[in-house]
C-alpha cells in the first residue's frame, strides 16, 4: 500500500477515534433545527430579513470550527480533556508532519463542506425572500363613472398599505408600480424589473352602494396564477375586503404575520364611506405632487374627510404631511408650520400607535422645526409599523445628510430605492448626495438610471447638465437636455411626461437663461428671459425674482447700465415682497442680499447675507447650509471684499458643497476675483491648474 493511502487510512481512523463524524452529524442536525426555528420566529419578533441570513452564515462558519474542536478535545467522565495524540506519542518527524497534515486537511474539509452548503442554501434563502415580495399593480376601473378611478386607486393603495405593514414581506411602493397603468407587461417582466416574486392585479367596479372587486395573484417567476378572488359586497364592507386580501396574500406567500401587524391590518381607518372617498381622491392628488394647485385641492379634500369624521386619524396624518411639504417647498410661512404640527398632534391624540401619525410628526419636526434627532426618533417608530414604506427611508436619508452623516444618508436612500425602484424622486435625491460629495461617476450612474425610467424628467436632465458643468465646465449635456425638453413628447418619440407642468416650464426658461449666462451668451440669455411675461415665471417659487435678477446681470454684461439698474430694482422689489411673507426664510434673505450687492449697497448686502447664514448655518444644515455660505461669498466677491470671499470659497471647496473649481471658472459673480492671484492659487489648489 502506498504512503498516501496509509496516511488517508490513518486520517479516517483518527476521525472515527476522535468522534469527529459524530460531532459533524450532530452539528448539521442542530444547525438545521436552528434555521427552521429562526425562519419561523424571527418574522414574529419583527426582526429584519438580514438577521436570518446572518444566522445561516454564522452556522456555516462555525462548522469547520466545530470539527477542529472535536478533533482536539473529547468529553470524558472527568470533563472536557484534550484528546491524546497517538501519532505524536510514538515520536518521529514523519508522525508529527502527518499530525499537522491531518489538522490542515480537517479544517480544509470543513471549509469546503461549509462552502458547498452555503452555495446551495444561501440562494434558497434569497429565493425564499424573493417569493415573499409583491408588487400591487394599479387596479382597472370598470365603473361607468370615470370619477370612480380615484376609488379604484384608493382600493389599490389601501391593499398596498396593509401589505406594507407586514415586515416579512417586501412590498414595492405605489410610485414604482403606477407606471404600469395601461401599460401591459407580463408578470414575469414586471417581477424581473421590480425584483419581486409575485404580482397582484385586479379590477374594481362601483355601482351605487355596491362594489365588485376581482383580483389575481400571479407568480412572477412562471406567470402562473396562484389564486383569484371575486368580491361582491356593500360599499361599507370595502375595509373588510382589503383586510381579507392582505391576510390571504400573506398566507399564500408564506409570510409570517405578527399579532401587532394583524391588529394594524384589521383596524378600519374610518366608518364613514363619504369621508373615505374624499380621502382617496385627496391622497391621489397629494402623492402625484404635480402642482401647487393640485396640492391645495388635496388639502381641501382632506379637510372635507376630517369634517365628516373628526377622528379620521389617517386623514389627519396625511394632511399634516401635506402641510409640511407646502411649508418646505412653496410657502415657508408660520401658519403652514403650525398647521402641520397641529394635525400631526391630533392624529397622535386620536390614535397614538398609528405609524402614519408618527411619520407626520417626523415630517413636522424635520421641515418645520429642524429638530433632526427628534424627527428621526419619530421616524424609527413609524418604520416599525411601516417596514416597507420607502417614504420613511427617504426622509431618514434626507435628514441624515443635513446632519452631515453622508454615509448613513446614502444607505437609507439606497434602501428606499430597493423598496421603490422606479421612483425617480428617490433616485434624484440619491444623486444629490453624490453631487455634494463630488462623486460625479456615481451621480451620473444614478441619474441615468432615473432617465431610463422617465426619459423626459426635467429635474433629472437639468441635474445631469449641472453635473457636467460642475465637473468639467462642459455645456454639451445642457444643450442636449434643453433641446430635448423643448420638444413635444410625442414628436420626440419619447415615453414619459407629455406636456410640461407650469413649474417645469418656469424651470426650463430659467435654466436656459442661466446656461447662456455661464457661456457668456448674454443676448441669448436676455432674449430667453424677455420671451415671456412675469406670469410665465411664477410656476416656481422665486421664479419671478430670478427672471428679473438674471435680466439685470445680462444687461450689465452688455453695457446696458440703465436697463440693468431698472431690472435689479424690480428684482429688489420682488425679493422684499417675498421676504415680507416669510421673514425667517434663509433663501429669501439671500436673494435680497444678492440684488443689494448688485445695486452697490455694500453694507446692507453683507448684513443681509450674514443674516441668511445665521438663519441656516452649516452647523444646522450640512446640505442646504453651504448654499447660504456660497451666497455670502458671492456677495463679498461682488462688493470687493476679496479676502473674505476667498476664505469662504476655500472652506466650501474642502468639504461637501455645490461649489466646484469648474463652476468658479465660469460664474460671472466671480469676475472681480479673476485678476486676484489668490483666486488663481485657490483654483490650482483644488483643481488641475488648467
What are these regions (language model features)?
Residues 61-64, 71-78, 166, 220, ...:
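Phosphate/oxyanion-binding loops and surfaces in catalytic or ligand/nucleic-acid-binding neighborhoods
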Residues 486-488, 568-569, 610-613, 647-655, ...:
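TPR/TPR-like (Sel1-like) alpha-helical repeat modules
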Residues 663-690:
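Terminal, low-structured helical/coil segments at or just beyond the last alpha-helical repeat
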Residues 359-367, 398-401, 432, 590-637:
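Alpha-helical adaptor scaffolds
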Residues 1-115, 119-120, 224:
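An N-terminal, helix-rich hydrophobic module
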Residues 41-44, 95-555, 560-563, 567, ...:
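Acidic, proline/glycine-rich low-complexity intrinsically disordered segments
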Residues 634-666, 671:
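C-terminal structured "cap/appendage" subdomains that terminate the fold
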Residues 593, 633, 645, 673, ...:
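Hydrophobic, well-ordered secondary-structure elements that form the walls
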Amino acid at each position: 500500500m502506498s504512503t498516501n493511502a496509509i496516511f488517508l487510512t490513518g486520517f479516517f481512523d483518527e476521525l472515527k477515534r476522535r468522534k469527529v463524524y459524530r460531532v459533524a452529524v450532530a452539528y448539521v442536525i442542530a444547525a438545521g433545527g436552528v434555521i427552521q426555528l429562526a425562519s419561523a420566529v424571527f418574522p414574529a419578533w419583527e426582526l429584519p430579513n438580514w438577521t436570518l441570513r446572518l444566522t445561516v452564515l454564522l452556522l456555516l462558519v462555525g462548522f469547520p470550527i466545530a470539527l477542529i474542536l472535536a478533533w482536539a478535545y473529547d468529553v470524558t467522565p472527568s470533563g472536557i480533556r484534550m484528546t491524546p495524540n497517538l501519532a505524536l506519542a510514538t515520536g518521529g518527524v514523519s508522525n508529527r508532519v502527518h499530525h499537522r497534515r491531518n489538522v490542515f486537511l480537517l479544517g480544509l474539509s470543513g471549509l469546503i463542506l461549509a462552502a458547498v452548503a452555503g452555495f446551495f442554501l444561501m440562494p434558497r434563502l434569497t429565493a425564499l425572500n424573493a417569493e415573499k415580495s409583491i408588487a400591487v399593480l394599479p387596479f382597472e376601473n370598470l365603473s361607468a363613472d370615470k370619477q370612480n378611478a380615484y376609488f379604484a386607486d384608493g382600493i389599490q393603495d389601501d391593499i398596498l398599505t396593509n401589505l406594507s405593514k407586514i415586515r416579512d414581506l417586501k412590498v414595492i411602493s405605489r410610485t414604482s408600480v403606477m407606471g404600469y397603468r395601461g401599460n401591459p407587461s407580463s408578470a414575469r417582466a414586471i417581477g424581473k424589473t421590480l425584483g419581486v416574486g409575485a404580482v397582484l392585479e385586479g379590477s374594481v367596479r362601483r355601482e351605487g352602494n355596491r362594489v365588485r372587486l376581482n383580483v389575481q395573484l400571479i407568480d412572477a417567476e412562471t406567470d402562473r396564477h396562484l389564486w383569484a378572488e371575486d368580491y361582491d359586497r356593500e360599499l361599507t364592507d370595502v375595509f373588510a375586503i382589503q383586510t381579507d386580501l392582505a391576510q390571504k396574500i400573506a398566507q399564500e406567500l408564506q409570510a409570517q404575520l405578527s399579532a401587532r401587524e394583524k391588529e394594524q391590518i384589521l383596524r378600519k381607518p374610518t366608518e364613514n364611506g363619504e369621508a373615505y372617498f374624499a380621502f382617496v381622491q385627496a391622497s391621489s392628488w397629494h402623492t402625484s405632487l404635480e402642482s401647487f394647485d393640485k396640492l391645495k385641492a388635496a388639502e381641501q379634500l382632506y379637510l372635507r374627510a376630517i369634517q365628516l369624521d373628526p377622528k379620521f386619524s389617517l386623514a389627519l396624518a396625511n394632511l399634516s404631511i401635506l402641510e409640511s411639504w407646502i411649508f418646505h417647498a412653496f410657502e415657508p410661512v408660520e401658519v403652514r408650520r403650525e398647521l402641520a404640527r397641529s394635525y400631526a398632534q391630533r392624529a397622535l391624540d386620536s390614535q397614538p400607535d398609528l405609524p402614519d401619525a408618527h411619520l407626520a410628526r417626523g415630517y413636522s419636526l424635520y421641515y418645520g422645526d429642524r429638530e433632526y434627532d427628534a424627527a428621526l426618533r419619530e421616524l424609527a417608530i413609524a418604520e416599525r409599523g411601516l417596514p416597507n414604506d420607502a417614504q420613511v427611508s427617504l426622509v431618514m436619508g434626507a435628514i441624515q445628510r443635513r446632519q452631515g452623516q453622508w454615509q448613513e444618508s446614502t444607505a437609507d436612500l439606497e434602501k428606499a430605492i430597493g423598496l421603490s425602484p422606479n421612483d425617480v424622486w428617490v433616485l434624484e435625491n440619491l444623486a444629490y448626495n453624490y453631487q455634494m460629495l463630488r462623486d460625479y461617476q456615481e451621480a451620473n450612474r444614478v441619474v441615468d438610471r432615473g432617465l431610463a425610467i422617465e426619459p423626459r424628467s426635467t429635474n433629472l436632465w437639468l441635474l445631469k447638465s449641472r453635473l457636467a458643468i460642475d465637473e468639467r465646465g462642459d455645456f454639451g449635456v445642457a444643450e442636449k437636455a434643453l433641446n430635448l425638453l423643448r420638444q413635444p413628447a410625442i414628436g420626440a418619440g419619447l415615453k414619459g411626461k407629455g406636456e410640461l407642468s407650469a413649474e417645469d416650464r418656469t424651470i426650463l426658461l430659467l435654466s436656459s437663461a442661466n446656461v447662456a449666462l455661464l457661456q457668456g451668451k448674454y443676448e441669448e440669455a436676455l432674449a430667453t428671459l424677455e420671451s415671456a411675461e412675469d406670469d410665465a415665471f411664477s410656476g416656481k417659487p422665486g421664479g419671478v425674482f430670478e427672471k428679473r435678477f438674471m435680466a439685470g446681470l445680462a444687461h450689465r454684461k452688455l453695457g446696458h447700465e440703465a436697463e440693468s439698474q431698472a431690472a435689479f430694482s424690480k428684482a429688489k422689489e420682488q425679493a422684499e415682497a417675498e421676504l415680507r411673507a416669510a421673514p425667517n426664510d434663509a433663501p429669501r434673505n439671500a436673494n435680497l442680499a444678492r440684488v443689494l450687492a448688485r445695486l452697490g449697497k455694500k453694507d446692507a448686502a453683507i448684513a443681509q447675507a450674514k443674516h441668511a447664514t445665521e438663519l441656516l448655518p452649516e452647523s444646522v444644515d450640512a446640505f442646504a447650509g453651504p448654499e447660504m455660505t456660497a451666497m455670502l461669498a458671492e456677495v463679498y466677491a461682488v462688493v470687493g471684499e476679496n479676502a473674505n470671499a476667498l476664505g469662504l470659497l476655500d472652506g466650501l471647496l474642502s468639504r461637501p458643497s455645490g461649489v466646484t473649481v469648474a463652476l468658479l471658472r465660469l460664474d460671472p459673480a466671480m469676475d472681480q476675483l479673476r485678476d486676484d492671484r489668490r483666486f488663481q492659487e485657490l483654483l490650482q489648489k483644488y483643481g488641475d491648474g488648467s
